[in-house]
């Protein structure tokens, strides 16, 4: 929250505490969530004999836990690639000033690998986690990844792909996700 006290001849933009003025201007970013969602979550936690200490936005928590203090102060975007969605937050002067999300995430990358290599989703997730990357180097053309499938066809199940081929499957989806985040930031006036 940024607040400013506007008086007849002065404008205080740091903190209006203890000041006197005619108007109080407030610039804030508000995140909303359905009350039922919070109640359901709190009920689940309570049924596990735990207490809910509080509720916080995942975008806020990700930014606070991954950005160093200087980044939060000078300004940075934190992008959190989740399974089914990607959240992003902007920090400036140690405050989150914007947050949002798009409905693309790591599961979409896994699905692309599954389709591209013709392997089950479980196998694709293991391949992504163990061998995934986004920038191909010269050694990646020679780095072979053994693909295990479950079709019953020995030739099909026991084959290899290069790490470069895997990167070629993953990179377009990640680029799409980052472009979508960039578009949302442009729409919000931050790019």
Explain the meaning of each model-derived region.
Residues 1-12:
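Single conserved hydrophobic/aromatic residue that forms the stacking wall/gate
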Residues 9, 67-98, 113:
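Gly/Thr-rich phosphate-binding beta-strand-loop-beta motif of the actin/hexokinase/Hsp70
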Residues 13-24:
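Residues forming anionic-ligand binding surfaces in small-molecule and nucleic-acid pockets
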Residues 25-35, 50-51:
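Flexible, glycine/proline-enriched loop segments at strand-loop-helix junctions
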Residues 30, 35-43, 60, 91-179, ...:
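Phosphate-binding glycine-rich/basic clefts of nucleotide- and phosphate-handling proteins
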Residues 43-54:
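A short, contiguous, amphipathic alpha-helix enriched in charged residues
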Residues 56-64:
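Short acidic loop-to-helix transition motifs that present clustered carboxylates
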């Amino acid at each position: 929250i940024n607040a400013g006290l506007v008086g007849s001849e002065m404008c205080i933009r740091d903190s209006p505490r203890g000041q006197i003025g005619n108007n109080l201007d407030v610039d804030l970013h508000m995140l909303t969530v359905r009350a039922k969602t919070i109640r359901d979550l709190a009920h689940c936690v309570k049924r596990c004999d735990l207490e809910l200490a509080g509720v916080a936005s995942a975008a806020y928590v990700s930014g606070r836990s991954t950005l160093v203090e200087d980044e939060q102060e000078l300004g940075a975007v934190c992008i959190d690639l989740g399974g089914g969605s990607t959240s992003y937050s902007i920090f400036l002067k140690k405050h989150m000033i914007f947050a949002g999300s798009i409905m693309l995430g790591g599961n979409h990358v896994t699905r692309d690998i599954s389709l591209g290599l013709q392997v089950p989703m479980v196998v694709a997730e293991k391949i992504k986690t163990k061998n995934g990357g986004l920038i191909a180097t010269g050694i990646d053309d020679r780095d072979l990844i053994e693909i295990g499938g479950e079709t019953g066809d020995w030739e099909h199940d026991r084959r290899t792909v290069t790490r470069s081929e895997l990167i070629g499957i993953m990179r377009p989806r990640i680029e799409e996700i980052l472009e979508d985040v960039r578009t949302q930031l442009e729409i919000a006036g931050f790019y």
